[in-house]
């Protein structure tokens, strides 16, 4: 399974992004194959913050449309939200201090 980064999500969503065609084609290909892929929650948050931001885009995506885009992706049977478990902080801390 692969995780899709914020940059791919933004480029695929925004038709005015310079790499829209490539990113959109990549996501469409993943969808057509039906291979499992993941949306990390931090990337979902970053996507929402980016595409709706008026300082980034002259015509930002309305929040409702951005939420619908994420909802469509998460609604696909082969897309999985990716999150850390409850032990994440303890494991990270132990690895960094070891």
How would you label these PLM feature ranges?
Residues 1-39, 54-69:
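Short, well-structured N-terminal submotif of metal-dependent ribonuclease cores
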Residues 29-30, 73, 95:
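Hydrophobic helix-cap positions at the C-terminus of alpha-helices
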Residues 39-44, 84-88:
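Short, conserved alpha-helical segments within structured domains
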Residues 44, 66-70, 89:
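A general structural signal for well-ordered alpha-helical segments in protein cores
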Residues 60, 76-98:
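Active-site neighborhoods of divalent-metal-dependent phosphate/nucleic-acid chemistry enzymes
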Residues 69-77:
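Short, solvent-exposed helix-to-loop capping segments enriched in aromatics
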